[in-house]
Amino acid sequence: MEDLENKKYWIWFSLIKGLGCVRKNNLLKIYGTPEEIYKLSKRELLKVDGIGEETVTNIIEAKNEKILNYHIKYMEKNNIDIIHICEKSYPQALKQIYDAPASLYIRGNKEILNGKNIGIVGCRECTDYGKKAAKYFAYNLSKEKFVNIVSGLAKGVDSYAHWGSVGANIECESTKNCGKKQESFGKINNNCGKINDDCGKLKNDCGKTIAILGNGLDMIYPKENIELANEIIRNGGTIISEYPCGTKPDKMNFPARNRIISGLSKGIIVIEAKEKSGTLITVDFALEQGRDVFVVPGNINSINSVGTNDLIKQGAKMVTSYEDIK
């Protein structure tokens, strides 16, 4: 991990309240780096188009060395890095969207951010069918197509998608259980007893999973996913957020988080969505960003399938197998 002292101005830039991604990126186009913005006086900042007095006050107040040093030390202690939009390691697909984050906080493997990524989204209160479908697609895309699975670490479909990819990596890594019966994440009917005949594969042979948070990396939300978060990192995946440490989960952050899920991905797979589901926000982002939208058909008698089945009626591509994802 690069010395965070070299990135302290990017950390400072992320701590400014009330300054959104679009205005941050506009400032970067004018001044080049956060360090140059940091040097500006209040009078100079007030001359910048689109920056009002309240925002200027927030920029000046964020120049607090004590708070900045606290963040640097906390990040160093907890293996949290920050990558910025001017770095090669910053996801190039995400860089192309209108409101790309100026920086991303990251724990884990940043090498996968520029890989083959597919998002999986759906209901928090998913049915057993949704659970099995999420595991099935994530497991097989990771194992058979070496695709990284992107999701939001929320309850329901998100969690099962992450677990499906983690399961593929655990199975690929294992060389001790060749020929033994194991639970298969790769069967949509959750049929246990599959023989693992792919033992001996290196962990790197499988796609990983990327979790996007709507809060700082100093906490995992929901708490029940702490174990999952640890398994993601342990198995070569990564957890990222545009929000600095100390940012609590807020309902306003999650729709913004969704644009990163789709922005990082070549396309998204929708598994169960109610008629007015928040999942459909991610679909809207994906369409705006020119991403593919794949939809798993659902039970016509289930409220969890109203949104997904409507998407199919509107022309989204229906998928019933991981092999349908091209």
Give the residues covered by each predicted segment.
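Short, small/acidic-rich helices and loops at N termini and domain boundaries
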Residues: 1-86, 295-296
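Glycine-biased, small-residue-rich flexible motifs in mid-sequence functional cores and linkers
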Residues: 2-4, 77, 84-326
